[in-house]
């Protein structure tokens, strides 16, 4: 699993960098343009690789017929060919450690969702409080469990229970500014009319 995510991450970064090159979305001062070479999206093990070498890596990243194991083997071979094995191995080790940490945190968050959801339900069902007190209680719970509260609010919004963000960016499903309206308040799929 970690290798799959590692390969996908490397491939995504490389494709993003390739798209930002000449003819891509990077503009004249982006990677590959007339401005500084390289770019922030370049994996560290490719920084000192020639443009021709980067094209070889790119060919592997974009080859959808390779299995992940085959692609990883070819990437490691290219890293050796271009003398960046140590930097590549460090990148892989760092990415693997990061993915392990994410998996651990994800498991903890998933384990907390039921309890945090029950706490949110208790807060929202308490009618003996002001709206401000309710908001403060939710904020206090969010400070203790920020990811869990945001995940639950996101899930509720997907199910039509509440908005993810406040403000005047649209109402609940079917309400003013909700999904029955288009992206800018006009008819779905059409431009915003003259209001």
Curated annotation (Swiss-Prot):
Signal peptide: none annotated. InterPro entries: ANIS5_cation-bd (IPR003677), SXP/RAL-2_related (IPR052823). Residues 167-195 have a biased composition (Gly residues). Residues 162-195 are annotated as: Disordered. It comes from the Eukaryota. Belongs to the SXP/RAL-2 family. This is SXP/RAL-2-like protein 2. It comes from Caenorhabditis elegans. The gene is srlf-2.
